[in-house]
């Protein structure tokens, strides 16, 4: 038995079998969105899904220095002006607090469990009660810049509705938003782009990891653009000049 086995691809003389399709045919007849969808999920998207995933893949193209991925990548490029290490370092800055929709995805999984045979509103009320009572932050909600509404989430939700792809996960996360406002009175913690991507990914039948993969694909062009700019026009060896020391005063003797 071979050391590796895979259902993703097979390289043969003169071609590549990607999920049962000829890569040469994909190159000629498919878009990048369709090819990425096929590679990650094992199937080709239909026309409506392709259009929605086009929106997904442009939703995180750039968000400036608000994104820790950009700041990290530019610092790395400043100290080590090489493209690939800086891009890789930027991706490593993604996680539970930025970019990754994985935690929002699992919130929706948990809400489904709490809802059982109940309504979206009942599921939302139960999960909000749990998180608020335990003083836990709801993943997929809130943004440091977009206080009342994350326009990227709004655009994707509108597009999903227009295309007939606003499924149960979108409806559920919107119900969670309403329940949170009703419970706390806070209107400045909207559904953010991570929450929107998680809901859309679930409605498209993606796994949590597949949803994260599409988020990373979305952020890469902007991240790479910042790395290129930093290498070509930025300051060498950026550093933070100001920092408050909060330790003991310099008074000890050895």
What are these regions (language model features)?
Residues 1-254:
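Non-transmembrane, aqueous-exposed alpha-helical and coiled segments at domain scale
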């Amino acid at each position: 038995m071979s050391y590796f086995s895979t259902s993703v691809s097979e390289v043969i003389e003169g071609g590549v079998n990607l999920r049962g399709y000829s890569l040469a045919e994909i190159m000629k007849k498919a878009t990048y969105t369709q090819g990425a969808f096929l590679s990650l999920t094992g199937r080709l998207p239909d026309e409506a899904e392709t259009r929605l995933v086009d929106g997904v893949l442009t939703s995180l193209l750039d968000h400036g220095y608000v994104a820790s991925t950009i700041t990290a990548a530019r610092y790395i490029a400043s100290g080590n002006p090489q493209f690939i290490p800086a891009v890789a370092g930027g991706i490593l800055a993604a996680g539970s607090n930025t970019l990754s929709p994985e935690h929002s995805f699992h919130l929706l999984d948990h809400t489904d469990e709490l809802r059982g045979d109940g309504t979206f509103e009942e599921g939302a009320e139960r999960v909000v009660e749990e998180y608020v009572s335990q003083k836990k932050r709801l993943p997929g909600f809130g943004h440091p810049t977009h206080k009342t509404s994350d326009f990227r989430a709004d655009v994707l939700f509108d597009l999903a509705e227009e295309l007939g792809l606003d499924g149960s996960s979108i409806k559920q996360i919107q119900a969670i938003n309403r329940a949170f406002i009703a419970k706390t009175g806070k209107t400045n913690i909207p559904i953010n782009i991570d929450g929107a991507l998680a809901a859309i990914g679930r409605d498209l039948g993606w796994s949590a990891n597949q949803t994260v993969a599409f988020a990373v694909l979305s952020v890469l062009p902007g991240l790479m653009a910042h790395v290129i700019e930093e290498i070509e026009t930025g300051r060498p060896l950026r550093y933070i000049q100001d920092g408050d020391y909060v330790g003991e005063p310099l008074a000890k003797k050895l």
